[in-house]
Amino acid sequence: MTSDIVVIGGGVAGVTAAQSLRSEGYDGRLVLIGKERELPYDRTALSKAVLAGDLADPPLLFPADWYDEWQIETVLDRTVLQVDVTRREVLLDGGPWLKVDRVLLATGASARVPSFSGSDLPGVATLRTADDVHRMRRDWEPGQRLVVVGGGLIGCEVATTARKLGLEVSILEASDELLQRVLGRRIGGWCRARLMELGISVVLNTGVAEFKGVDRITTVIGTDGRSFVADRAIVCVGAEPETAIAEQSGLACNRGILVNDSGGTAAEGVFAAGDVASWPLLTGGRRSLETYINSQREATAVASAMLGKAVHGPQLPLSWTEMAGHRIQMIGDIEGSGEYVMRGDPDDGPALLFRLSDGRVTAAVSVDAPRDFAMATRLVERGAQVGREVLGDTSMELRELNRAARERALIAE
């Protein structure tokens, strides 16, 4: 069995790459392999609409007949056991070997579960797949006491949804503020207040020492020694890139598969994108970004590179969430050195938080301000030089600041 290009991974990175390959004119054989039985679906709906019961299943990224129309072969509910990067072969569980010209590793990430005692007790959940959320919906009932371990994006989204379902919810967060890494302390604190208004208990500076129970979880023991009664618990403390295949194949990995800014690995013809890839950042350094939008952007860049086109696609973290009735968007790393500028007040309406580093706009977070966020995104991507007083002045349109920054950049060139 031969194949020109094999995409390993049925998430947004894999299917976006397949679509981009066809859009850019690739007409050879194209195989998409996914370990789940479902066609690629929107994982961002799992912690919100699907868990809430508003949707029975997560929306498919594309309908079944789309794959036929685009001549993309799907191999579902199968696991890739090995990739021979020298011979360019891919081994499926149960066989066969697939002979390939190029391969894309888009294997994603799995939920991180710290190795504390009791993490395997019934009633302790993680959320990464449709099967995970279906089990939670069957198992969770109004009035149950749920402990959410981790106050990041997924943890806070799950907590909000669980509260709507009538559960009594507590969040345990090991740091001194919710969402601090992705939203910054100011917006993180504002989100904490909104969650508490919903009746969610938030406990900061407290991680988990162990889960206790006999046939099912009954208690969560915090790192500060306190006990929290728990009928159910969910662990939301990040994800681990699925690098096993890459490591077995001899590819360099460090918290993700190391790739260049077009997604290429050290092995010719082997590429990686999405949550599994440690991608170069526009601001320097590298890491796995673990966002839907970045996965799409990486996959698009990789598709071009796989077809021999010159691509340079360093990334900026770019994501969004909906929480307690508010839409929050973010670009860049809001936590870091420099100074902060708040434009507006989220208590009174739309607002943006900017981080300036060496006088340049390096990150932004918006609350209920999608139009201004679009302008803020351009400022961050350009690394625009804007004074803090001007940036925080709501009487000045961000569009005008953008225009001025663009003109300065053209003059500098």
Swiss-Prot record:
Top class in the EC scheme: oxidoreductase
Induction line: Transcription is up-regulated by aromatic compounds including biphenyl, ethylbenzene, benzene, toluene, xylene, cumene, cymene, and chlorinated benzenes. Is under the control of the BphST two-component regulatory system.
InterPro entries associated with the record: FAD-oxidoreductase/Apoptosis, FAD/NAD-bd_sf, FAD/NAD-binding_dom, FAD/NAD-linked_Rdtase_dimer_sf, Reductase_C
Gene Ontology annotations for the cellular component aspect, listed alphabetically: cytoplasm
Entry EC number(s): 1.18.1.3
Annotated binding of FAD, by residue: 4-35
Catalytic activity: 2 reduced [2Fe-2S]-[ferredoxin] + NAD(+) + H(+) = 2 oxidized [2Fe-2S]-[ferredoxin] + NADH
Binding site for NAD(+): 145-173
GO MF term (any one): oxidoreductase activity, acting on NAD(P)H
Pathway stated in the Swiss-Prot or TrEMBL entry: Xenobiotic degradation; biphenyl degradation
GO biological process, one term: catabolic process
Keyword 4Fe-4S appears in the UniProt entry: no
Pfam families, sorted: Pyr_redox_2, Reductase_C
Keywords carried by this UniProt record: Aromatic hydrocarbons catabolism, Electron transport, FAD, Flavoprotein, NAD, Oxidoreductase, Plasmid, Transport
Necessary cofactors: FAD
KW GTP-binding (keyword) present: no
Description of how the protein assembles with itself and partners: The multicomponent biphenyl dioxygenase system is composed of a ferredoxin reductase (BphA4), a ferredoxin (BphA3), and a terminal oxygenase (BphA1A2).
Family membership noted in the UniProt record: Belongs to the bacterial ring-hydroxylating dioxygenase ferredoxin reductase family.
Function: Ferredoxin reductase component of the biphenyl dioxygenase system that catalyzes the stereospecific dihydroxylation of the aromatic ring of biphenyl, yielding a dihydrodiol compound. Is likely involved in biphenyl degradation that allows growth of Rhodococcus sp. strain RHA1 on biphenyl as the sole source of carbon and energy. The dioxygenase system can also use naphtalene and 4-chlorobiphenyl (4-CB) as substrates, as well as some polychlorinated biphenyls (PCB) such as 2,2'-dichlorobiphenyl, 2,3-dichlorobiphenyl and 2,5,2'-trichlorobiphenyl.
Name listed for the protein in its UniProt record: Biphenyl 2,3-dioxygenase, ferredoxin reductase component
Source organism of the structure: Rhodococcus jostii (strain RHA1)
Originating gene: bphA4
